[in-house]
Amino acid sequence: MSTICPPPSPAVAKTEIALSGESPLLAATFAYWDNILGPRVRHIWAPKTDQVLLSDGEITFLANHTLNGEILRNAESGAIDVKFFVLSEKGVIIVSLIFDGNWNGDRSTYGLSIILPQTELSFYLPLHRVCVDRLTHIIRKGRIWMHKERQENVQKIVLEGTERMEDQGQSIIPMLTGEVIPVMELLASMKSHSVPEDIDIADTVLNDDDIGDSCHEGFLLNAISSHLQTCGCSVVVGSSAEKVNKIVRTLCLFLTPAERKCSRLCEAESSFKYESGLFVQGLLKDATGSFVLPFRQVMYAPYPTTHIDVDVNTVKQMPPCHEHIYNQRRYMRSELTAFWRATSEEDMAQDTIIYTDESFTPDLNIFQDVLHRDTLVKAFLDQVFHLKPGLSLRSTFLAQFLLILHRKALTLIKYIEDDTQKGKKPFKSLRNLKIDLDLTAEGDLNIIMALAEKIKPGLHSFIFGRPFYTSVQERDVLMTF
C-alpha cells in the first residue's frame, strides 16, 4: 500500500473487530462535514490483524476524500447517494453512502464508507448490491437515532443546563458498530466460502448415473423448480456439509457467473449466519438438528427465497415477487416506526423482535409448499439423465436449457411491452399470454416470470400487483366487520 500523508487532525476513535478468517475489508468509516474544518472522521472500524495495511491517518485521509465536494450538495430530503471511488494511485476502492442528517443541532452531510484494496475489485463487484442495501438500511436507522438523541440532549440542556451540545449524537456509534460488524463478517465469509464462477458439473447432482442416486427424484425436481420460481434465491440447510454443498453447487448451475460469486458454500466446522441478499447459501443445523431462519433478514432479501432441507427432503418457498416486495415494504415501515417510537436505548437496540402495529402484523409462516408444478424442469431432468455422465454433454445440454429459459423470458417481456405499449396501457389478458407463449402450466409461468423480473425489475408488480393489492384491501375491509 502506497504511503499517504495524513492531515494534522486529532486522533479518531477506532473499534477493532475480531473476524474469523481473512478479511477483504481494510476499514469502515463514519465521517461528517464540519462547516469550519471541512470533512472529519468520527469513527473507524477495522478488522483486527497482525499486519497493519492502513494506518489510522491513512484511513482518515481516504474517508475525508469521500466528502470532498459535498459542501454544495443539493439533494432531496431523505436522499442517499452511492459513490464508488477507485483510487489507483492509492491502491484502494471506496464505497461511500452520502446522506444528510441532524447532529449537534445542525443539519449536515455524512458519509458511511467501506474501504477495500483495489485487488479485491472483482471480488467486491458481485456483492455491491448486497452491501449497498445493508448500508442503506443502517442509514435509515441512523437518521432516526441521531434525531432522537438530539431531542433527548436538548431536553437535558433545558432541564439541567449542564449538558454540552458537542456530546450530542455520541451514542449513535454503538448502534453503527452493531450494524457494521455483520457486514464485515459477511465479506469475510464470502472471501473464504463463496461459490466459484465456474462449477464442475461432476461436483453436482447432475453428474449422477441416474436420477435419484444422490437424492429423491421428486425432491430434486421441486428444489430446482422452486429455485427458479424464486428468482434463483435459495437457502439449503442440513446436518452434512458435504450434502448441503452438493445441492448448493447444483442450484448454482442455474445462475449466471456473477450470481454464483454472490452465493456461499456451507462451512464444515460451524454454521454461518443467514445473510439476506445472497442468491444461494448453505447452512448447517445445530447439534439438536434444527435451524431457525431470522425473520427480519428473510423479509429484507431482495427476492423471495426457497428453503431446502436436505435431511428430510422438503422444499418450501416464499410468495412470489410482487407479494414479497409488498410485505417487505410494510414490514420495513413498521420496523422503522417502532424504532422511532422506542423510549429507551434497549428498545432501540432490540433487533430480534417482530415489529407490529395497528395496520400490519407480519405472517410468520412465510414459507409454503411448492403449489405449482412445471413442465420445463421436469422435461429437462428426464432428458439430461439419459445422456452419458462424465462427459461435456450434460453441461452443453444445461447451457441450452438456460438459453431457452432466457429467450422465453425476453419473449414474455416483448409480449407485455407490445400489449401495453410499454406500460402506457394496462395489461389485458394473462390467459392469452399463457396460451400464446405456451406457458399454461402455472409453474412454467412462474419460472419465466421470475427470470423476466431479474431482466426487467418491476414486471411482477406491473402484471400481478393491482389484483393483489385489491384483494389485500378487500381482506382488510372484511376484517373490520
Swiss-Prot record:
Function per UniProt: Acts as a guanine-nucleotide releasing factor (GEF) for Rab GTPases by promoting the conversion of inactive RAB-GDP to the active form RAB-GTP. Acts as a GEF for RAB39A which enables HOPS-mediated autophagosome-lysosome membrane tethering and fusion in mammalian autophagy. Component of the C9orf72-SMCR8 complex where both subunits display GEF activity and that regulates autophagy. As part of the C9orf72-SMCR8-WDR41 (CSW) complex, functions as GEF for RAB8A, and RAB39B, thereby promoting autophagosome maturation.
Could you tell me the gene encoding this protein? C9orf72
**Location within or outside the cell:** Nucleus; Cytoplasm; Cytoplasm, P-body; Cytoplasm, Stress granule
Phenotype reported upon loss of the gene: Decreased life span. However, another report did not observe any effect on life span. Lymph node and spleen enlargement phenotype accompanied by macrophage infiltration. Severe inflammation also observed in liver. Increased total white blood cell count due to a significant increase in the number of circulating neutrophils. Significantly reduced platelet and red blood cell count. Increased levels of autophagy and lysosomal proteins and autophagy defects in the spleen and liver. Impaired activation of MTOR/mTOR. Massive up-regulation of the cell surface receptor Trem2.
Q: Residue ranges of region Required for the homodimerization of the C9orf72-SMCR8 complex?
A: 461-481
Q: What is the lineage of its organism?
A: Eukaryota, Metazoa, Chordata, Craniata, Vertebrata
Question: Where does the dDENN C9ORF72-type domain start and stop, copy by copy?
Answer: 370-464
Recorded protein name is Guanine nucleotide exchange factor C9orf72 homolog
Q: Give GO terms: molecular function aspect only.
A: GTPase activator activity; guanyl-nucleotide exchange factor activity; small GTPase binding
Q: Which organism is it from?
A: Mus musculus
